[in-house]
């Protein structure tokens, strides 16, 4: 009789990190306010809103962290299967992405008038395929914030490979890796500032040259942030969830972020957009991934609920806002006097409904047919 073969125990599922989900709500709202508000309305928080574009870099870094937090152990044990992972991520990403394109169909009329016929045809094909971000001129075609989903899709594609890369086992080596990835993230912004490829000596958020768009919207410049997040998950695994260290890290990250954003107008814009804040994002994430006063605040149930709809809010907000205001809905209903606050409420309501009625049912259906 052959000896029994003992299979390796399945990797335990990681615990949830509700405070980070709550933080996603604030980051998504900050992008909404950045696009559609006057930062001065927010008093002491004005510097955060005025530099709301940095929330996108935060999302990309946290994407690497969350994926590694959930999948690194499975990759090490051999349980991570790339096709299964891709289906899981696609079921989360694409239904809402496609719904947002349907909501944004009216934007194609405007795109037709400002693009060449070749550009328009390329945009119509590339955007549903999550490829538009690879073309600087087409990255914001059809749905402006959707370029980040092209970047995310690329990161999802490579994640099963890069998560298996050998990384240091000790905190010191991991810290060196984080530092090197941060420096790598600064290479392209520094080159842009040095070479002035668009002919702009002092680029800012309104600079719209080809090379600035390549720096802001194409996937490669954001890869160091994603990899930084993966390594950060290894650092996180070595720190106790309880204790004052996490609290101090979180406080240091939040204070550092506020300080840098307060002086945001004096910081090099390409670096701010593409990775300068990685270390401070990391401190904030490590702090909120613990059990302390800050994580309890961001883990407040309503914040977490909105954080779960943050992707829907992000991908829908730009064109849904324009649709609300171009339709005359607020004037016809007499709600215009409550604008913009009523518009923010409508965006949040639309995001939550999209999550409940489209994202989650579609996710369950796609996963069921793949089993």
Pin down the residues of each PLM region.
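Juxtamembrane loop-transmembrane helix junctions in multi-pass integral membrane proteins
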Residues: 12-18, 41-50, 85, 89, ...
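Transmembrane alpha-helical segments and their boundary/interface "anchor" motifs
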Residues: 53-56, 72-108, 118-127, 153-156, ...
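Functionally critical transmembrane alpha-helices in membrane proteins and complexes, commonly lining
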Residues: 15-73, 91-101, 122-136, 279-284, ...
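Membrane-interface junctions at the ends of membrane-embedded or membrane-associated helices
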Residues: 72-79, 165-173, 233-247, 289-305, ...
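C-terminal "closing" transmembrane helix and its immediate cytosolic amphipathic cap
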Residues: 1-11, 166, 296-304, 318-371
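Conserved beta-strand->loop/alpha-helix structural units within folded catalytic cores of enzymes
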Residues: 23, 28-31, 63, 94-98, ...
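Aromatic-enriched alpha-helical transmembrane segments of multi-pass intramembrane proteins
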Residues: 122-147, 153, 157-277, 318, ...
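Alpha-helical transmembrane segments of multipass membrane proteins
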Residues: 100, 104, 184-189, 281, ...
């Amino acid at each position: 009789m052959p000896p029994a073969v003992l299979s390796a125990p399945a990797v335990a599922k990681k615990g949830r990190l509700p405070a980070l989900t709550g933080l996603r709500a604030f980051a998504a709202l900050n992008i909404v306010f950045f696009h559609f508000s006057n930062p001065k309305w927010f008093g002491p928080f004005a510097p955060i809103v005025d530099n709301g574009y940095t929330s996108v870099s935060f999302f990309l870094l946290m994407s690497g962290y969350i994926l590694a937090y959930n999948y690194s152990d499975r990759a090490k044990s051999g349980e991570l299967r790339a096709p299964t992972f891709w289906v899981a991520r696609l079921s989360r990403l694409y239904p809402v992405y496609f719904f947002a394109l349907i909501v944004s169909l009216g934007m194609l009329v405007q795109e037709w008038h400002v693009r060449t016929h070749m550009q328009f045809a390329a945009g119509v094909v590339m955007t549903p395929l999550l490829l538009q971000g690879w073309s600087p001129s087409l990255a914001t075609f059809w749905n402006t914030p959707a370029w980040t989903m092209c970047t995310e899709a690329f990161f999802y594609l490579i994640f099963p490979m890069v998560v298996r890369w050998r990384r240091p086992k000790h905190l010191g080596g991991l810290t060196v890796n984080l530092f090197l990835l941060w420096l790598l993230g600064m290479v392209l912004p520094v080159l842009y500032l040095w070479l002035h490829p668009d002919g702009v000596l002092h680029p800012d958020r309104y600079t719209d040259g080809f090379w600035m768009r390549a720096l802001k919207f194409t996937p490669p410049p954001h890869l160091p942030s994603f990899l930084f997040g993966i390594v950060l998950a290894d650092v996180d695994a070595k720190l106790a969830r309880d204790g004052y260290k996490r609290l101090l890290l979180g406080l240091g990250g939040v204070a550092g972020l506020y300080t840098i954003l307060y002086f945001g107008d004096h910081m090099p814009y390409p670096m701010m957009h593409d990775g300068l804040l990685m270390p401070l994002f990391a401190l904030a994430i490590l702090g909120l991934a613990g059990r302390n006063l800050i994580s309890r605040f961001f883990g407040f149930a309503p914040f977490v609920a909105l954080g779960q709809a943050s992707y829907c809010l992000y991908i829908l907000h730009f064109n849904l806002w324009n649709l609300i205001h171009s339709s005359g809905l607020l004037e016809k209903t007499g709600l215009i006097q409550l604008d913009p606050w009523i518009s923010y409420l409508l965006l949040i309501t639309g995001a939550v409904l999209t999550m409940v009625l489209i994202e989650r049912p579609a996710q369950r259906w796609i996963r069921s047919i793949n089993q």
